[in-house]
Each structure stands twice: as C-alpha cells, then as structure tokens.
Amino acid sequence: MEWQPLDFERPIFDLERRLEDLKNHSDKHDVDLDPAMKDLEAKLRETRRRIYGNLTAWQRVQIARHTQRPFALDYIDRCFANWVELHGDRRFADDKAMPCGLATFGGQRCVVITHQKGRNTKENVMRNFGCAHPEGYRKALRLMRLGEKFGMPVISLIDTPGAFPGIGSEERHISEAIAVNLREMMTLRVPIVAAVIGEGGSGGALGIGVADRVLILENAYYSVISPEACSAILWRDRRHAAEAAEALKLTAQDLFKLEIVDEIVAEPEGGAHRDYDSTAANLSKALRGALQQVCQLPVAELLEKRYQKFRRLGVFSEGKTVSASAQA
C-alpha cells in the first residue's frame, strides 16, 4: 500500500521519491550514485526530525484521521487470537460500526469492544464512518455483562469521530445508551482496559471508555468536541480548527499531563500507518502491562480505584474577586 502523505508531510514524500528514483537509476544503469544518495538520506533524516519532532495539535489530529491508519480489526488480527465476533444488541439491530466479540490475549480469554472505520466509500457506508448507533453501545454492554458473568476482562479499542447524531439514532435514545454504559462500566466487576487508537470523539468515545487503565497512541486524540466544531462555535468559522485544537488540549501528550490517560503508546516515526506491525507490538505490550496491573486487584479495590480515578479528573482555577468600586 503506497503511503499517502498529508499536506505537511509533502517535503518528506518528495525527498523519499527522489531517493527512490536515484536508487532505481543507479541499479538500472550501474552508476555509482552513493554520494548523492547519502546526501539525500541525510537531508531526509533531518526533514523527518524537524517535521515529526515539532508536530502541532492539528497535525496530530490529521495523523489520527489518516485513511491508512490501522483500525481496530487490524490490531485484532495482530494482537489477539481466536477472535469470534458476536452480533446484535437483542433489541433492534447489529451495529457494524462497533465490532465486538471474544478473543484470547496473552493466553487469557477476554471481551473486546471496538469502533471500526472503513478504508473506502463502500466500507465507510457499511461502518457508518465509525459513528456508532445506540444498538452499538447496547451490544457492547451486552458483551461486557457477558464478560462479567464469566470473569473475563474487557479490552476497548476506541476510534470514532463521535456517536451518530441522526434522527433514527436520537429516536432510539443514543444519549441514554451512552449514559447507561457509563453507569454500568463504572461498576462492572471485571478489569477494563481502554486504548484510544485514533479518534476519541466526545461521548461516542467515552461510551466504551470508562476503564481502570486508559491508554492512547502517540498521535491519537481524545476530546469533548472536534476542532472544526469548536472553531465553528467560537469563531463562527471552521477555518480556526488549528487554534481550536491547541486550546482543547486533546493530544496524547496534553492528556497525559492532565492525568486523563495513564500511558502513551509509542508510534513509529510518521505515525502508525507507516508500520502496522511495530505499532501493534507496542500496543500489545502496553495492553498486557495494563492488564497485569489491574487483574491482580481484588474486586472491591478494583471498583474503588476506578471510581476514584474518574472522580479526580479535571482541574479548575479561581479568579480574583473584583469589587464594584474597582469595576467603576
């Protein structure tokens, strides 16, 4: 699969193409172009270091949305064994935006709940662009309760722009479905580990994100609102999305500082889409470590720590009181 660069990656892409052309020319015509190629390789390394070492929040959002980025099922193929997908919420339908099922991870049987996007128009229509309906969240809850019944930990892979806001979704009470998941996950009597692997959009992400450990990939984001929507509300113009992204503190690095997430999972240089296997290996290692930490806890302690974890979220500051005379 040929790499499709983002706008800010164009200088890297152009250098890589030039380097490839030189190598092909050297091989084809048996010409020694090693000095030129070494110079170009040095320039490429420096360009990569400069661009990827200084990514803005908005650039990380673009990487998180990259159409070639590995999705949940790509990680399931690489990190899990004996995957069996289960379907339906037993009320209305099966939501293909949220594949959920049973799998083996690190020799242990577990429940896996996910969001899934598509790579082309046909797949995106089937997956609803990763935007789940109420039946998706109810299916996820059905499987989590199954995991609780049989003592299986829950692993959640989050990658959604947000829950689907269509008329049918509202008629079937999407807000209620998410709210019930928040309540039930808080008291689920088995360990829960969540990982934001791409987009973590608002309540749609949080609906399967109440966990004992929350991981996030290096270039993923987790936010109450998309930068474009925030820009449209605050500036009445979507063109301020980059400024909104900075203000929202939605990057993995900001979220870790704010203690919203517990661990940042490293990605290869350029993003997860540049190397699926190494990203999957990093995620698998992080998930295994997180599960080891929480699986050894007694149930009562597990639930108390989960409750306190979410009670501690958020910071506030107080402004100085200004008297009426001072205002005058």
Where do the PLM segments sit?
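Short hinge/gating elements
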Residues: 61-64, 125-129, 270-273
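Short active-site-adjacent helix-start/loop capping segments
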Residues: 70-72, 120-122, 164-166
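Short, motif-level signal for alpha-helix interfacial/capping segments enriched in acidic residues
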Residues: 33-36, 136-137, 230
